[in-house]
Amino acid sequence: MTVTTSIQRPQAPRLRFLASFKPKSLADAVGTCLLFLGAWLVIFPFVWMLSSSMKPADEVYDSNFHFWPETFVGGANYYGVLFDQPYLTFLANSFIVCIGILIVQLVTAVPAAYALAKLKFRGSTILFGFVVASLTIPINVTSIPIYLGLVKFGLLDTYFSLMFPFFVSVFAIFLFRQFFKDYPDSIIDAARVDGFSEIEIILRLILPAAIPAVAAFSVFSVVAHWNDLYWPLIVVQSQDKMTAALSMLQYQSEFDNDYGRTFASATVVTLPMVVIFLFARRLFIRSITMSGIKG
């Protein structure tokens, strides 16, 4: 009696990779095409930016787009951005402003969110309603009174003036409250029985469990204020306090626009944010799924 044994050979990695893109139905095929189209629409501006940063100004808006420039001036463009101007100072200013804002936002938002989520007091629901309503107020509405106050106290062109309007983040309070509400009340009650103060409960119990939410908000906050141009354009009056985003305007004037260096500057400004997101993406995605922000 002969027994035939068939041995299944594992698929090569390349075949498995290609098989993952094989649509199972027409709907899957259409969905895959739409996803590829959406991904390309998101990626193409960065491709354009990187390509333009290596071209001379007259080639940036050539009608025949090609990624690799006919005349390569990428080295000159990036050298001019990094060394002809104190660009490292601009980057340092942006880091100082973003980190300073983030620290104060966390210090103010975490206790406020904990109080709204776990402490029972009269008017808490109404207070939370005001918090949600405050999300609809843009900074443009409050910029004039804040600016006049900074002028009166002589605080223009300082790190404080760049950070002050953003010290309290209503979005952070809302995000952390949604996250804290899911934390078990029984653990908090047990901690109180053991003699924990409310601050100790926040620092030793709540905050370690909220690391994904903190990471997600940190990405939101740092990216938003790193890219901010509106407020620095109002309060910065010297090159010493100029941020990286604001410094890109130096390559544009009424009579001349150095587009090559402008795009090189934009690439240098964008790179740190891409790196931060790549390192924090898992915590970012986890916080979206665990908090109240769901599609």
Task: Write out the residue ranges for each language-model feature.
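Short, Lys/Arg-rich, polar N-terminal cytosolic tail immediately upstream
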Residues: M1-P23
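A structural signal for multi-pass alpha-helical bundles of membrane permease subunits
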Residues: A27-G295
